[in-house]
Curated annotation (Swiss-Prot):
InterPro entries, per database record: Cell_div_FtsL
Name of the encoding gene: ftsL
Family to which this protein belongs: Belongs to the FtsL family.
GO biological process, one term: FtsZ-dependent cytokinesis
Organism: Streptococcus pneumoniae (strain ATCC BAA-255 / R6)
An annotated GO cellular component: cell division site
Protein name: Cell division protein FtsL
NCBIfam families: ftsL_broad
Amino acid sequence: MAEKMEKTGQILQMQLKRFSRVEKAFYFSIAVTTLIVAISIIFMQTKLLQVQNDLTKINAQIEEKKTELDDAKQEVNELLRAERLKEIANSHDLQLNNENIRIAE
């Protein structure tokens, strides 16, 4: 078994010796390039996930603000109901004049 391992090691050494320095440099550069590309892909995927997460948070905040705005508009509409204004005017012995009512947006 040890002889077989030794023979395999010798075969690999012989094959490596067969390659010239240029070929070794070429294969080394391919390996380094492959490694750099793999690391870059992982980095970009991580950044993409972070951006998607940030986008989701911002969209949630936008929806929350829209809901707050809709609630505020609803409250303004409820406060400007004609019946409510008449009740307030009557309770303070005032006369309701519709020309003096303005809606702020």
